[in-house]
A protein has these predicted regions:
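Active-site lining segments that contact anionic ligands and/or coordinate catalytic metals
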Residues: 228, 264, 288-291, 310, ...
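Residues immediately within or flanking Cys/His clusters that coordinate Zn2+
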Residues: 312-318, 322, 362-372, 515, ...
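Ferredoxin-like iron-sulfur electron-transfer modules
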Residues: 295-318, 345-368, 662, 672
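The feature marks the mature, well-folded catalytic cores of soluble enzymes
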Residues: 1-307
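Iron-sulfur cluster-binding electron-transfer modules in prokaryotic oxidoreductases
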Residues: 40-42, 90-97, 107-194, 201-204, ...
């Protein structure tokens, strides 16, 4: 976190035009995306794209040579640029040699990456962006806010003002009239242009063909009307065959704009001819006299050599991750990004630009995993963000406060207990009668302006369950209860309810005394050493009594126990084997209750309406979605589905502490959706989500209750 980023976040959140634009457009994108994916097997198609990209990057040296050979045979001049400066110099030199005065440019994120337009303009060459969105941000003097929707952050009123000024006409806000005016203004630029510049969505090695996808036709004109066409292409865009390209097309436009297929697909194989029919060259079909392809490295080969970050090269730049990202929905890509936006942008920025810029961008990630779920190449962006933070922590060191918090306190459970006990006494002047903290002093008040906080318990769960530190010798299923820090110290009564319900369900639950923090705060901040130490502590504590299963009430903890411990112990085979055995025993509370009572019948209606919030780490982290609903319905509750039930509540990552104003923005959307259901109670099987939702609803003076399903069931027994 930096003061500069905090200011940028605040500016975005208080920009009425930006907030209006994001609300309008992202809602529309979500709607059309649902339509476009209806009846489509996203799982199998995304697995196919993943395979194609894995194979392409693995075989990239050979594919590059094949592409260069085939493109050269087709009459293309291929130049390999080491970095941005090398690429820019080549294009500028070519333009100067051809006495180019006017250039039309089709959309290219690589062009943005290397700042090609700015480089050419400094040399006195006029460059016009021809993608409508890119043209709008060019007129505004800004950078794109989205990988495929550059002007998504602009309202229609702002767009009308920009186009009116550019064309000298007084235009209203009718979209078609604005498009017509833009087309008229841009049409002459194609005719006047001496050079066209494009990127490429795909480069096909077997024929040396570039594939350019657009929705406006500007790509066709920019690559055919001028006498010289220059394409700047990242090496990662190269695939083996036309078949591979076709597979990518199946999802590309659905993910970008909710369209089943792109409006225009240009296949470019050399100058003055086209490959409209694969394998059948049509000569004399018009087009440029010269085609130059600039293959750009700029850090890509280095990225390919890293096991931790190679999969960032699988990105097809569709923007699906941005369309579902709660942080992007609040501040857009000019805050949550450098050149490339979002979580994937943070990874790309680390290699293509600067680790300092990447660190700033990564600090905004909530870790909700919505991006991973939406990605057509199945890229694990959250995991790469975690690796980036670990790499930065190793390279630059952790801030002093983090080192103390993680290495000196969190790592040692007795110390953490003492600190919490001290805190439970120091908090007293700020605790209201209902055990809520609504105002903290000094800088900490930024947090209580967002949510009301629960008071720390004077009797943490460890003290309350001293008599349950080991299971009794019975034939009942032995269930180890892993509570997590928030339940243990802020909501111990929920832990007691868990024990009560599990006993009623015929289990023998116990609370292993040796359990410690799962290590998530340290792990996701990059402190791998502390996280590994805590992993070993918990593995030893939880496996000691040989439980049949391990129940959790915090999905974040469950995901760490189930998945991250495998990663943390990967270099130590014996510990990794123990972690793997542990992972197979992890159960969410609702899962376990259904397993323990499979034959329980449905109870009569309680005439109580509830809605359910899907915690990010429960649904996307460990794959539990239907079980909580099944349990609630079986117990006689009427479940009213809220809109975007699986959208993040804003608690995740370090955002709630580092950027409370951003967390509040994400939370607002969730609370609005909860209230819209008319439910009396919102249920969620995540303790941190309970903290966030209760705190947010309290600030609204709402009468809606927030409960864990264990609390609800305990009251019915």
């Amino acid at each position: 976190m930096s003061r500069a980023m905090t200011k940028r976040v605040h500016k975005a959140l208080t920009d009425e035009n930006l907030q209006t634009a994001l609300t309008r457009l992202l809602g529309l994108i979500k709607f059309v995306r649902q339509i476009a994916f209806t009846g489509l097997d996203f799982e199998s198609l995304s697995h196919e794209i993943r395979r194609i990209k894995e194979d392409s990057i693995a075989n990239l040296p050979q594919l590059v040579e094949q592409f260069k050979s085939q493109a050269t045979k087709a009459g293309v001049v291929v130049y390999e640029a080491e970095d941005a400066d090398d690429a820019n110099k080549y294009v500028l030199k070519l333009a100067q040699e051809r006495k180019v005065k006017h250039i039309v440019k089709s959309k290219s994120m690589l062009g943005e990456e290397i700042e090609l337009r700015e480089h050419l303009e400094k040399a006195g060459i006029e460059v016009t962006e021809t993608d409508i969105g890119e043209w709008i941000v060019q007129l505004a003097g800004e950078r794109p806010a989205h990988l495929v929707g550059p002007a998504i952050h602009k309202t229609i009123e702002q767009v009308a003002e920009l186009i009116s000024k550019a064309t000298g006409q007084e235009l209203g806000t009718d979209p078609q009239a604005l498009l017509d005016a833009a087309r008229r203004a841009l049409r002459q630029t194609y005719i006047d242009a001496d050079m066209g510049i494009s990127g490429a969505n795909i480069a096909i090695a077997e024929t040396g063909t570039l594939v350019v996808v657009t929705n406006e036709g500007n790509g066709c004109m920019a690559t055919t009307l001028p006498s010289v066409h220059v394409a700047v292409v990242g090496y990662e865009k190269i695939v083996s065959s036309w078949k591979d390209a076709a597979a990518i097309f199946r999802l590309l436009s659905r993910c970008t704009a909710g369209m089943k297929m792109p409006v225009y697909i240009s296949h470019i194989t050399g100058p003055g001819r086209t490959d409209a029919i694969p394998g059948a060259m049509l000569h004399g079909a018009g087009g440029p006299d010269e085609v130059h392809i600039v293959l750009v490295d700029n850090g890509r080969w280095q990225m390919r050599e890293t096991d931790e970050f190679r999969e960032a090269l699988y990105c097809i730049k569709c923007g699906a991750c941005l369309n579902v990202c709660p942080v992007f929905a609040s501040v857009a890509g000019q805050v949550y990004g450098y050149i490339y936006q979002g979580g994937i942008g943070a990874i790309l920025t680390a290699f293509l630009h600067s680790v300092d810029e990447a660190e700033e961008v990564a600090s905004l990630c909530l870790g909700c995993m919505a991006c991973k779920e939406a990605c057509p190449a199945r890229i694990d962006i959250p995991q790469m963000i975690t690796r980036l933070r670990a790499s930065l922590a190793q390279e630059k060191g952790l801030p002093l406060l983090n080192r103390i918090a993680y290495g000196s306190i969190l790592k040692h459970q007795p110390r953490l207990d003492r600190v919490i006990r001290i805190g439970s006494h120091l908090q007293q002047p700020f605790v209201d009668a209902d055990l809520m903290i609504r105002r903290l002093p000094g800088p900490l008040n930024a947090l209580t302006q967002t949510i009301s906080l629960p008071a720390l318990s004077h009797r943490p769960l460890r003290d309350r369950l001293k008599d349950y530190s080991s299971p009794k010798l019975t034939d009942k299923p032995k269930v180890a209860f892993y509570a997590g820090c928030v339940a243990a110290y802020a909501y111990p009564e929920i832990g007691e309810d868990v024990m009560k319900v599990l006993k009623e369900c015929g289990a023998e639950p116990y609370y292993p005394a040796g359990q410690a923090c799962c290590g998530a705060p340290a792990y996701f901040a990059g402190d791998v050493e502390t996280a590994l130490s805590l992993a070993k502590t918990n593995i030893a504590a939880l496996e000691e009594m040989k439980p049949d299963c391990i129940v959790t009430v915090c999905p974040g903890c469950a995901a760490v126990l189930q998945r991250e411990y495998l990663s943390l112990t990967s270099a130590e085979p014996r510990w990794n084997q123990r972690a793997r055995a542990l992972a197979g025993k992890i159960r969410d509370f609702s899962q376990l209750v259904l397993e323990l009572t499979p034959s329980a019948g449905e109870k009569p209606s309680r005439n109580q309406k509830v809605t359910y919030h899907d915690p990010c780490h429960l649904k996307r982290g460990i794959g539990v979605y239907s079980e909580p609903r099944q349990l609630l319905q079986r117990e006689g509750f009427e479940v009213l589905e809220m809109a975007d039930s699986d959208a993040c509540c804003g608690f995740g990552g370090h955002v709630v502490l580092s950027y409370p104003e951003l967390s509040k923005s994400v939370l607002k959307r969730k609370l609005d959706n909860i209230e819209a259901t008319g439910a009396e109670t919102v249920i969620t099987n995540c303790i941190p989500c309970i903290l966030q939702l209760r705190g947010g609803l309290d600030k609204r003076h709402s009468h809606i209750k927030v409960m864990h399903s264990a609390e609800l069931l305990a009251k019915s027994f």
